[in-house]
Amino acid sequence: MPVTVNAFEDLVSHRQIADFMGSVMVERLLDLAIARADDFAPTSVGNGGGGTVSPDIRASLLLRDLGELRSELETRFAAVLDDTVRELRLSDIALHSLELELVAHNEGAFYSEHIDTFTARPDAQSDRALTGVYYFHRNPKGFDGGELRLHAIAPAADGTRSFTDIAPTCDTFILFPSWVPHEVRRVSCPSGAFADSRFALNCWYRSAR
């Protein structure tokens, strides 16, 4: 009798693009983050809209206003959508918009396992379909940890559940379907200096309903 494999037990493919923005953009992003350090606010969790600050689930700092860099970032992120859909064998994404945020993870910061799709917004005109995470940081790197852990949806018959850890390498862009369970592993930043944080630009490709 043939053995069947439950697809939910397997890891979903992701795409990893090294040297995505280049050193000049990395420096521009670092300059933005450091200059706007006082404007970062605690991250929240929740089903879109106004979330709740829950440091036992998510501990990090967030900036949504990317100023004059936003348009250039959107152009760069949008340029890889079609190739990513083909490489990951996803259904076509009718791009409605890009949702961007800049997140800083410092000493002890993390984000527990979650998915990026929302289910309780029937009035929304679009949904998160593809998640992108772009990493940058100061050199030499001032933190350890902070890996992106991608999980299989379900455990295998023996109770084990597959996962893979992706290091937050500077100038690397990671893409995966927004419904994939994932987490940010805890960060160690001995100096505690904001400039030594693990910085990430989260980009959600929103598909029109």
Model-derived features: positions:
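Membrane-topology and secretion signals of cell-surface/extracellular proteins
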Residues: 97, 101, 173-176
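A short glycine-rich, His/Asp/Glu-containing loop-to-beta-strand
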Residues: 98-111
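Catalytic core of Fe(II)/2-oxoglutarate
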Residues: 128, 144-209
